[in-house]
């Protein structure tokens, strides 16, 4: 097998996820109850057998660092690792100025490892992918660069790099986040082909392009705007169709599932995808597991069954993590992170509760995201009067109420 290296860009600030990113990097935001967003890309590489991963961090990385150090210990004796790489300022006293600059400032890692092929992936998407299939495509095409892509609705095209390909899958056009004149897919005027932000380079070509870009004072030093857009006309740049990627244990409904969780509404919906009876993305695929840090928390506990008084502890259509106690309350269509407590006579619906959230008695909460260490006092109602909620919390365009970490909530 060719010598491979994965460089994972995990330094994103994630401003559109505020307030969830006020105290943590975007890849460290909890997802699906017991995971962090970064776990999905790391699990894809681990399951694919790519076991040399460098995670480039920058913005408020403490919780991300701790999570990776605690949960991603590979076998050093076999030269397998997930290593955190902070901004080292090797080229001067400055932070990363873009995704391409992040690689340039860490070129020493690539030259030291001497991989034949280098993956450059983001750390802020939710999906399963066997990257070996992308590698095989790259080798078959003799590509210098392969970009993973997925169809998106035309109305969402302005959020992505939009690609045009020929009949052989070679890139013949690329526009980063077009505001007008979107090039649609052949035969389908409703969709455009979007870059997933996942790149596979033949390493020699990567080094050449990164060094060239670093010397361009007018460059944005961004992989989409600066590297891909400049490279496809003079190098062999091909586009890998992610919809053709087949993961063991994955059903037809899940194939091609990929979510950019860069906004609060998108993040909320991707979480809600998990709790459906027949989910479009399942966490229960033993043949392609999502790995994460393990915690020594006790089992979930449901207590009280006084149906006469309505004091019944139970959860329906929900994901409930270890250490939770549902004490005479009801969680419906929810995702509960570890050590959540829902007390008697309370109803929580269509919500995401982060670790160590405590819901007092007689509360009614719906369509909310509650960050860690929040205490909701008894008799509190959230999600039923959005005008009132806007005075206290952040409310998204679609009406999701977001409560920041450790906020003191008044009844």
From Swiss-Prot:
One of its GO terms (molecular function) is glucose-1-phosphate adenylyltransferase activity. The keyword Nucleotide-binding applies. Alpha-D-glucose 1-phosphate binds at residues 161, 176-177, 195. Its EC number is 2.7.7.27. It comes from the Bacteria. It catalyses: alpha-D-glucose 1-phosphate + ATP + H(+) = ADP-alpha-D-glucose + diphosphate. Pfam families: Hexapep_GlmU, NTP_transferase. Keywords: ATP-binding, Carbohydrate metabolism, Glycogen biosynthesis, Glycogen metabolism, Nucleotide-binding, Nucleotidyltransferase, Transferase. Disulfide bonds: none annotated. GO terms for biological process: glycogen biosynthetic process. The keyword Nucleotidyltransferase applies. Pathway: Glycan biosynthesis; glycogen biosynthesis. It is an enzyme of class 2 (transferase). Belongs to the bacterial/plant glucose-1-phosphate adenylyltransferase family. Homotetramer. Involved in the biosynthesis of ADP-glucose, a building block required for the elongation reactions to produce glycogen. Catalyzes the reaction between ATP and alpha-D-glucose 1-phosphate (G1P) to produce pyrophosphate and ADP-Glc. This is Glucose-1-phosphate adenylyltransferase.
């Amino acid at each position: 097998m060719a010598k491979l290296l994965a460089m994972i860009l995990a330094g994103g600030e994630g401003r559109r996820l505020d307030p969830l990113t006020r105290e943590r990097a975007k890849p460290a935001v909890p997802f699906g109850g017991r995971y962090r967003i970064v776990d999905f890309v790391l699990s894809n590489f681990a399951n694919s057998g790519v076991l040399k991963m460098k995670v480039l961090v920058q913005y408020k990385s403490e919780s991300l660092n701790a999570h990776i150090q605690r949960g991603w210990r590979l076998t050093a004796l076999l030269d397998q690792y997930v290593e955190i790489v902070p901004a080292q300022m090797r080229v001067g006293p400055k932070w990363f100025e873009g995704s391409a600059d992040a690689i340039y400032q860490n070129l020493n890692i690539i030259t030291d490892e001497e991989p034949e092929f280098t993956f450059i992936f983001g750390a802020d998407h939710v999906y399963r992918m066997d990257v070996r299939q992308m590698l095989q495509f790259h080798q078959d095409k003799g590509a210098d660069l392969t970009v993973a892509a997925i169809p998106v609705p035309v109305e969402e095209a302005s959020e992505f790099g939009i690609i045009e390909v020929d009949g052989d899958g070679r890139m013949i056009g690329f526009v980063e986040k077009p505001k007008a004149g979107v090039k649609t897919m052949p035969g389908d005027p409703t969709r455009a082909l979007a870059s997933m932000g996942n790149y596979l380079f033949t390493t020699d070509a990567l080094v050449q392009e990164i060094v060239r870009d670093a010397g361009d004072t007018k460059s944005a030093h961004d992989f989409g705007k600066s590297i891909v857009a400049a490279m496809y006309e003079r190098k062999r740049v091909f586009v890998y169709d992610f919809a053709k990627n087949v993961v063991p244990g994955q059903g037809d409904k899940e194939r091609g599932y990929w979510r950019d969780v860069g906004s609060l509404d998108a993040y909320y919906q991707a979480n809600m995808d998990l709790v459906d009876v027949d989910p479009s993305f399942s966490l229960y695929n033993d043949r392609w597991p999502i790995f994460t840090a393990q915690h020594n928390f006790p089992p979930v506990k449901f207590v009280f069954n006084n149906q006469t008084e309505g004091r019944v502890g139970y959860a329906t259509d929900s994901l409930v993590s270890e250490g939770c106690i549902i004490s005479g309350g009801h969680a419906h269509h929810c995702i509960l992170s570890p050590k959540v407590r829902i007390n008697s006579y309370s109803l929580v619906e269509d919500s995401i509760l982060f670790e160590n959230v405590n819901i007092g008695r007689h509360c009614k909460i719906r369509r909310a995201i509650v960050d860690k260490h929040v205490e909701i006092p008894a008799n509190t109602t959230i999600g039923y009067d959005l005008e009132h909620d806007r005075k206290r919390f952040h409310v998204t365009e679609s009406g999701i109420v977001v409560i920041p970490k450790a906020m003191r909530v008044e009844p």
